[in-house]
From Swiss-Prot:
Record organism: Pisum sativum (Garden pea)
Name recorded for this polypeptide: Albumin-1 F
SUPFAM superfamilies, alphabetized: omega toxin-like
Post-translational modification: The C-terminal glycine may be removed from PA1b.
Source taxon at top rank: Eukaryota
Classification of source organism: Eukaryota, Viridiplantae, Streptophyta, Embryophyta, Tracheophyta
Pfam families associated with the record: Albumin_I, Albumin_I_a
């Protein structure tokens, strides 16, 4: 039951983020996004900075990620980042080629398992069956 509510909330935020970023225009990078959107934030000029594994916020790419990456315990660019932060041993990169960073996992198999289960299609399917 909790996973259905979580999936519903994720889809709501992702949908809201798509509408907010499309209405604002290309010059502004604001709103909620999903790292699984292609391109994230509705334009390749913006970056989706995750605050959770499947949801984030849109920002201009100018230096924001470097500061956020250091502050967030699960964002990573390499396996070494995860080990240094103590958040895991494997940096699982998002399947979206527009996102150059990943999320720390305990192992490669855990990352593969998660990313194979979490896709926009699966989220929408789980919401429609609720």
């Amino acid at each position: 039951m909790a996973s259905v509510k979580l999936a519903s909330l994720i889809v709501l935020f992702a949908t809201l983020g798509m509408f907010l970023t499309k209405n604002v225009g290309a010059a502004s990078c604001n709103g909620v996004c999903s790292p699984f959107e292609m391109p994230p934030c509705g334009t390749s000029a913006c970056r989706c900075i995750p605050v959770g594994l499947v949801i984030g916020y849109c920002r201009n790419p100018s230096g924001v990620f470097l500061r956020t990456n250091d502050e967030h315990p699960n964002l990573c660019e390499s396996d070494a980042d995860c080990r240094k932060k103590g958040s895991g041993k494997f940096c699982g990169h998002y399947p979206n080629p527009g996102i150059e960073y990943g999320w720390c996992f305990a192992s490669k198999s855990e990352a593969e398992d998660f990313f194979s289960k979490i896709t926009q299609k699966d989220l929408l399917k789980s919401v429609s069956t609720a």
